[in-house]
Amino acid sequence: MDIRAAEISAILKDQIKNYGAEAKVSDVGSVLSVGDGIARVYGLDEVKAGELVEFPGGIKGMALNLERDNVGCVIFGDDRGIKEGDTVKRLGSIVDTSVGKGLLGRVVDGLGEPIDGKGPLKGVAERRRVDVKAPGIIPRKSVHEPMATGIKAIDAMIPVGRGQRELIIGDRQTGKTAIALDTILNQKAINEGDDESAKLYCIYVAVGQKRSTVAQIVKTLEENGALDYTIIVAATASDPAPMQFLAPFTACAMAEYFRDNGMHALIVYDDLSKQAVAYRQMSLLLRRPPGREAYPGDVFYLHSRLLERAAKLNEANGSGSMTALPIIETQANDVSAYIPTNVISITDGQIFLETDLFYQGIRPAVNVGLSVSRVGSAAQTKAMKQVAGKMKGELAQYREMAAFAQFGSDLDAATQKLLNRGQRLTELLKQPQFSPLSMEEQVCVIYAGTRGYLDKLPTSDVQRYEADLLRHLHGEHAALLASIRTEKKLTDDSESQLKAALAKFTEHFA
């Protein structure tokens, strides 16, 4: 065997010359203490606020408190497998989530991972950061398109527009979630149509709710054919506080994908009181100084930075919109508590639900006097404005008179007429759950109420009258309903047709 020394030395020299020391360097630290979903970590010198870190077993966390000698991290998962001395690795990225139409019809957790057992996500467009800045002033446009809820009391007197933030506030068990679900179900007709620019994709965020409640909501949406255009983000009561804090931001990033691509999204935060409680828990465990009601000082910023991301964009930015319906739970109708006042001041109006009304059988239990929509009237269809314009005033007068009428028995004819009309309008605004009405149906029904067609009926017959009237209109006057739907206003011709139809129907109603 011939060994050529020169050749071997040439090969070795070449190997040495081209040798690259490719050592993988990762910034690591070690756990000092862990408990209650919070880990104190020593040694992550270069970590940034809000950056993701990884604990043993693939459990992720987020660095929130950067102190001189340690870093306070919140853990997105079970902290029982983490112990003192464990190695923690920087991931060099901020929390992000999958977005796109592939998420429609799915149930995901607070990090955007599927939890519905239907396999991995398909058709995902991209990944987006969950906490981004809201659009500035220039890309926005004032709200001008209606976002129909299908609920008479809301669409007539507290109208919501696309791009608005309308708070739903009330005690527990007053029907807050029911209003949000009705709104999602009401989009079915639009979403089954061919007009892509009118479609409204819905995202429902369940924060700190029972798993059985979330399962019931999924079932309701599925049975009514609404799950196909809805994404459900669930951080339930058994999930760690960091997941409950993060879920609304994750869902918001999903809605922003639709908004930024010229589409329309509706997002329901159910509810932000529980998100604030989760954030308070995290802040106190991280030893941040407490403020009013033990919430941290930046709890206002927590909600404002989330809700400011709902917007209507102008034509140059694709004309997309994102409408937010945040829900807040009050204690004993106390609207002046810390979180309720914060969110009322951030949003563009509120729908106030009352326990007393609910128990009187007025459902949805909307207190029309305290509820307001600050920008929605610009988005209301002309037809609805024409028929419901005076309704809020009439009901306010009725409530005032009803309070006085309790004391006196002899009332003049005008007062008696006002009380009669008010009782019938209140009865007319009642609506069963999961039965939203289209705009043209609402217009006809409210026209009958405000123009005095119900004044001679017994109050107990009002709801039967409404059901029979709608059946009659669909059967005999389908063209009239179609004309109101396409024109979006009551023309002289359609108004005279409606008057004739109502007069004839009321005469024969028994």
From Swiss-Prot:
Transmembrane segments: none annotated. Keywords: ATP synthesis, ATP-binding, Cell inner membrane, Cell membrane, CF(1), Hydrogen ion transport, Ion transport, Membrane, Nucleotide-binding, Translocase, Transport. SUPFAM superfamilies: C-terminal domain of alpha and beta subunits of F1 ATP synthase, N-terminal domain of alpha and beta subunits of F1 ATP synthase, P-loop containing nucleoside triphosphate hydrolases. It is an enzyme of class 7 (translocase). GO terms for cellular component: plasma membrane; proton-transporting ATP synthase complex. It is found in: Cell inner membrane. Gene3D superfamilies: 2.40.30.20, ATP synthase alpha/beta chain, C-terminal domain (1.20.150.20), P-loop containing nucleotide triphosphate hydrolases (3.40.50.300). It comes from the Bacteria. It catalyses: ATP + H2O + 4 H(+)(in) = ADP + phosphate + 5 H(+)(out). GO terms for molecular function: ADP binding; ATP binding; proton-transporting ATP synthase activity, rotational mechanism. InterPro entries: ATP_synth_asu-like_sf (IPR023366), ATP_synth_asu_C (IPR000793), ATP_synth_asu_C_sf (IPR038376), ATP_synth_F1_a_nt-bd_dom (IPR033732), ATP_synth_F1_asu (IPR005294), ATPase_a/bsu_AS (IPR020003), ATPase_F1/V1/A1_a/bsu_N (IPR004100), ATPase_F1/V1/A1_a/bsu_N_sf (IPR036121). Its EC number is 7.1.2.2. Pfam families: ATP-synt_ab, ATP-synt_ab_C, ATP-synt_ab_N. ATP binds at residues 170-177. The record marks 371 as: Required for activity. It is a peripheral membrane protein. Produces ATP from ADP in the presence of a proton gradient across the membrane. The alpha chain is a regulatory subunit. F-type ATPases have 2 components, CF(1) - the catalytic core - and CF(0) - the membrane proton channel. CF(1) has five subunits: alpha(3), beta(3), gamma(1), delta(1), epsilon(1). CF(0) has three main subunits: a(1), b(2) and c(9-12). The alpha and beta chains form an alternating ring which encloses part of the gamma chain. CF(1) is attached to CF(0) by a central stalk formed by the gamma and epsilon chains, while a peripheral stalk is formed by the delta and b chains. Belongs to the ATPase alpha/beta chains family. This is ATP synthase subunit alpha. It comes from Maricaulis maris (strain MCS10) (Caulobacter maris). The gene is atpA.
